[in-house]
Amino acid sequence: MRIIGTGSAHPKHTLTNDDLSKIMDTSDEWIRERTGICTRQIITDENLEDLAAEAAQKALDDAGMKAADIDYIICSNVVFEYVTPSVASIVEGKIGASCPCVDLNAACSGFIYAIDFAEALLQTGRATNIL
């Protein structure tokens, strides 16, 4: 198993620790000391599915592949705008793929579970190219 392409997409709006201190009982110093985080990107005008599809398309481009080459889509995420359909199936439609799709909800460790699931699909011959 190997990763042959990556892609990312980020919300345009930045939320600083100082912004948070205006709406919560906290401070930049308190957050930085405990987490090391100074800023984070938050979705305001964008939506999760569009950002995921943008990242997926960039990963395909980086790998020199087309959506038709994908056998399976795995999406690991914590934030869902609604229960159904899955983010993976929305991404499938947005990029023009036609394959099985699944969302995994495992918070920060989700990437590890997604890689483990992908490896199992590859080892059993159920998929060759996984997004």
Task: Label each residue range with its predicted role.
Residues 71-77:
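Short glycine-rich or small-residue beta-strand-to-loop segments that form or flank ligand, phosphate
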Residues 32-34, 38-50, 77-130:
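Conserved catalytic cysteine-centered active-site region
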Residues 1-71, 95:
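Conserved "HGTGT" condensation-loop signature of ketosynthase/thiolase-family condensing enzymes
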